[in-house]
Amino acid sequence: MDMNTFPASTYCESIVRFLDAIEYHDDNLTHEERVEGLRHVHSKTAQYFTEPLPRSILKGVAPRRIAAVTRTISHFIVYCWSKLPREAQVDVSIYLSIINVLDDEISSEPSTQMTSFWSDLIQGKQPKHPFWVLFNSHLPRLLRHYGSFCAFNIMRCTFDYFEGCWIEQHNFQGYPGADCYPSFLRRLNCLGGAVAGTIFPAAKFDEQKLFAQMSCVMAQIDGPVALMNDLFSFYKEYDQDEANLVSNWCTVDGITMDQALTRLTDDTIHACVRILDILKDKDPDMLATIRGFIHGYATWHICDFRYRLREIYDREDLQESGARFREYFDKAIDVGWVDVEEWTCQVQGFEVEGPAPSGSEVQAYQANAFGFSVDTQRHHNIDYVGSSILGLFEWATRYLRGKLPLGNA
């Protein structure tokens, strides 16, 4: 799709409709709590990648990419798993960082390395694929925080995610009329089960007492996790020729991108409002946890440069919805923005060549986490390491100026 035809006003209406529907108000953390959480989770996550096993397995991965992933995922965990005990946050952060660092490895044809996977698993042998080598080591460390039901869902979702990546590397969008295919693939790779499993630690939630409520959350959580991400990703993925939920809908159902955006917005609102409505008269801590995740998830998307929502904010062709969009954007930045020097630190054994990120450049630096560039002259999926450092600094400077009062610009 041509970015010149992007329906900016319609997209603003969609974001505003969604944030209105959930009554967006992220009161999860104070600024000081965000800073403390980011410092701890980021430093411990980075330290993991200095250990011998990940160093050996990931020796072909650029340190700059690993650094970008640890920053992005640390943000994600602290903002969305805000009520989780700190050490559990660290282990969830490592779990998701492994997934994202190895995303390219999964997306290359894994059939050969997976030939003996199940027999090796059953017989307790070392797996061959690097994804499973690292998880064979880390999963016991993660699962110690959870009861058996949550742990089972974390494991189930980990297998699902790998399968989803395996399918996605073929870039197959489904046949016309295969109306179940888009949602099937999205459920596999959205990590909803891992979110629901990791958000309820055994130290704070009694699985036996809350089993019915947890089961219901497991059934409902894929929608908020997947669809919120798809809604906030709609702009940055608009001109990319890749299979995703929206483009798959267009292929199998024969609808336009505008129609797909309307469906996506309606489905996202339904998924989030429904899960909160179901829990409103249930365990108050469970409701607070899910509400905190949804509102923190919105804040994280707006604060993360990879979603490029500042570009929408700065457009001059927005209609009435543009003002409301900017209000919500500013609200999220005010509560969620943390400058890099407030929380990053050097981790011994984890040195990255080149200039260290400083100030607001951190969010642009994070652009490598999922392989997207924030170079505004080239919107496509390109490697951060090969992109223009000057372009990133210029983009970050424009962003910072955009969020400051006009008198300071």
From Swiss-Prot:
User: Which pathway does the database say it acts in?
Assistant: Secondary metabolite biosynthesis; terpenoid biosynthesis
- Motif NSE motif: which residue numbers? 227-237
Residue numbers of motif D(D/E)XX(D/E) motif?
Answer: 103-108
For the ligand (Mg(2+) 3), the binding residues are: D241
- List all membrane-crossing ranges: none
Family assignment from sequence similarity? Belongs to the trichodiene synthase family.
What this chain does, per the entry, is described as: Terpene cyclase; part of the gene cluster that mediates the biosynthesis of the sesquiterpenoid aspterric acid (AA), an inhibitor of dihydroxy-acid dehydratase (DHAD) effective as an herbicide. AstA cyclizes farnesyl diphosphate (FPP) to produce (-)-daucane. The cytochrome P450 monooxygenase astB then converts (-)-daucane into the alpha-epoxy carboxylate intermediate which is further converted into the tricyclic aspterric acid by the cytochrome P450 monooxygenase astC.
What is the protein name given in its UniProt record? Answer: Terpene cyclase astA
Gene source species: Aspergillus terreus (strain NIH 2624 / FGSC A1156)
